Each structure stands twice: as C-alpha cells, then as structure tokens.
C-alpha cells in the first residue's frame, strides 16, 4: 500500500480517491469564493482582489493574443483562464501543511489533459470541418500521407501524456521537496523553499495555460490565419 502523509481529509477517510476528490472539491470551492469576493463589488478603479484578478486576466490575454490572436484569445479564455487559475490554486493549496495538491495526483492531471485534448479537437472539427481538419494530419506531400497520418495521431495522443505527467511530476516533486524541508526544520523557518514552491506553482499553471492556447491555435487557425 502506498504511504500517504496525513492530511485533513484523513479525518473523513483514508481512501486515495476520496482524498484526491476532497481536495479537488475544496480547491474549487476556495477558488469560487475568492473569485466571488473579487467580483462582488466591481469598481471603476480596481482595488484589492479585483485589481489582482484584472491584472491576471490582462496578463493571460496579453500572452495568448501573440499565440492565437486577440479575438480567439478572448473567446477561449473561459477554458484556458479557468484551467490556469484552478491549476494555480491546486498547486498553492499543497503548500499548506495538512493539505494536498490535487495536481499531485496523476488521475486528476489526466482529467485536465483530456479536457484540453477533446476540446481542441472538437473546436478544430467545428471550425474547419471533419475532413479538412484531419486532412492536415496527412501533411502537404500526398505520397508521405500514409506515414505522416499515424505519426500525427500518435503525436496528438502523446500530448495527453506530456500535459498530465509534466504537471503531475513537477507538483509531486515539489510536495516531496516541501515534506523533506519540513522534516528537517520547523515549518516557520524554510521561507525560501516556500517561495520556490510558490513560483513553481505559478510557472506550472502558466505552462499548462500556454499549451492549451497552443493546441487550440493549431486546431482552429488555418494556414492563411498563421
């Protein structure tokens, strides 16, 4: 049996799936409450949480428009932005002693990767049409199509693995690093490791968001749109 560090979820159950689900829901609730607090009393001159959220949204759109264009960046922001924020909150909650990052579970990061995978294919088919979309998989040279098509299929499926394992591996490694530091010194002392994990959490959320936009751009932008 896999040994797990005690968390607040263990007060209710020691089941692995329950613990992961518990922190998935808890993270979603915390994210919703914080977001609600940021948007509850909107002001013309943003202050506090509203200012933070507007800065985050502006930063995401500023980066995304260079990848997919401003119009599509805004169109797909509800997906990419929500995933970025959720991954960020999921990463951050694991820094708190007694809590566990949902993104430290591969089953959860796999779900996120599958959401992105199916959505960008859905959008590609919707925008370009079924046959035109998959025709791109064959490449521009017809006689190479029998070789290129299966390679492209494998390449797209490998994105599920790379997206899910990249996030899972980094956050799991961060959690193990934090655990070792807390065993060596009191929790109030290792400020530097906490800061490293904080910035790593931001970085992983940023990377996941960027890749979401990159995959969407590859699916919906035609050759003329590049």
Curated annotation (Swiss-Prot):
<keyword id="KW-0812">Transmembrane</keyword>
<dbReference type="GO" id="GO:0005886">
    <property type="term" value="C:plasma membrane"/>
</dbReference>
<dbReference type="GO" id="GO:0045259">
    <property type="term" value="C:proton-transporting ATP synthase complex"/>
</dbReference>
<feature type="transmembrane region" description="Helical">
    <location>
        <begin position="201"/>
        <end position="221"/>
    </location>
</feature>
<dbReference type="GO" id="GO:0046933">
    <property type="term" value="F:proton-transporting ATP synthase activity, rotational mechanism"/>
</dbReference>
<comment type="subunit">
    <text>F-type ATPases have 2 components, CF(1) - the catalytic core - and CF(0) - the membrane proton channel. CF(1) has five subunits: alpha(3), beta(3), gamma(1), delta(1), epsilon(1). CF(0) has three main subunits: a(1), b(2) and c(9-12). The alpha and beta chains form an alternating ring which encloses part of the gamma chain. CF(1) is attached to CF(0) by a central stalk formed by the gamma and epsilon chains, while a peripheral stalk is formed by the delta and b chains.</text>
</comment>
<keyword id="KW-0375">Hydrogen ion transport</keyword>
<keyword id="KW-1003">Cell membrane</keyword>
<dbReference type="GO" id="GO:0042777">
    <property type="term" value="P:proton motive force-driven plasma membrane ATP synthesis"/>
</dbReference>
<feature type="transmembrane region" description="Helical">
    <location>
        <begin position="134"/>
        <end position="154"/>
    </location>
</feature>
<dbReference type="InterPro" id="IPR045082">
    <property type="entry name" value="ATP_syn_F0_a_bact/chloroplast"/>
</dbReference>
<keyword id="KW-0472">Membrane</keyword>
<keyword id="KW-0066">ATP synthesis</keyword>
<protein>
    <recommendedName>
        <fullName>ATP synthase subunit a</fullName>
    </recommendedName>
</protein>
<feature type="transmembrane region" description="Helical">
    <location>
        <begin position="18"/>
        <end position="38"/>
    </location>
</feature>
<keyword id="KW-0997">Cell inner membrane</keyword>
<dbReference type="InterPro" id="IPR035908">
    <property type="entry name" value="F0_ATP_A_sf"/>
</dbReference>
<comment type="similarity">
    <text>Belongs to the ATPase A chain family.</text>
</comment>
<keyword id="KW-0813">Transport</keyword>
<keyword id="KW-1133">Transmembrane helix</keyword>
<feature type="transmembrane region" description="Helical">
    <location>
        <begin position="105"/>
        <end position="125"/>
    </location>
</feature>
<feature type="transmembrane region" description="Helical">
    <location>
        <begin position="79"/>
        <end position="99"/>
    </location>
</feature>
<keyword id="KW-0138">CF(0)</keyword>
<keyword id="KW-0406">Ion transport</keyword>
<dbReference type="InterPro" id="IPR023011">
    <property type="entry name" value="ATP_synth_F0_asu_AS"/>
</dbReference>
<dbReference type="InterPro" id="IPR000568">
    <property type="entry name" value="ATP_synth_F0_asu"/>
</dbReference>
<dbReference type="Pfam" id="PF00119">
    <property type="entry name" value="ATP-synt_A"/>
</dbReference>
<comment type="function">
    <text>Key component of the proton channel; it plays a direct role in the translocation of protons across the membrane.</text>
</comment>
<feature type="transmembrane region" description="Helical">
    <location>
        <begin position="179"/>
        <end position="199"/>
    </location>
</feature>
């Amino acid at each position: 049996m896999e040994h797990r560090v005690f968390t607040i979820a263990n007060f209710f159950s020691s089941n692995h799936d329950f613990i992961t689900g518990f922190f998935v829901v808890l993270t979603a609730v915390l994210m919703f409450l914080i977001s609600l607090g940021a948007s509850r009393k909107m002001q013309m001159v943003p202050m506090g949480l509203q200012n933070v959220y507007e800065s985050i949204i502006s930063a995401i759109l500023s980066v995304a428009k260079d990848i997919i264009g401003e119009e599509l960046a805004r169109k797909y922001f509800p997906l990419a932005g929500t995933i970025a924020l959720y991954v960020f909150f999921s990463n951050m909650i694991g820094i708190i002693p007694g809590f566990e990052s949902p993104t430290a579970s591969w089953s959860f990061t796999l779900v996120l990767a599958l959401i992105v995978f199916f959505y960008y294919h859905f959008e590609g088919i919707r925008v370009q049409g079924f046959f035109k979309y998959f025709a791109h998989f064959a490449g521009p040279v017809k006689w190479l199509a029998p070789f290129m098509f299966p390679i492209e299929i494998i390449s797209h499926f490998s994105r599920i693995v790379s997206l899910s394992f990249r996030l899972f591996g980094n956050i799991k490694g961060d959690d193990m690093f934090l655990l070792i530091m807390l065993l060596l010194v009191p929790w109030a002392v290792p400020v530097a490791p906490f800061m490293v994990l904080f910035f790593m959490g931001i970085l992983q959320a940023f990377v996941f968001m960027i890749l979401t936009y990159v995959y969407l751009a590859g699916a919906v932008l035609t050759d003329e749109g590049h």
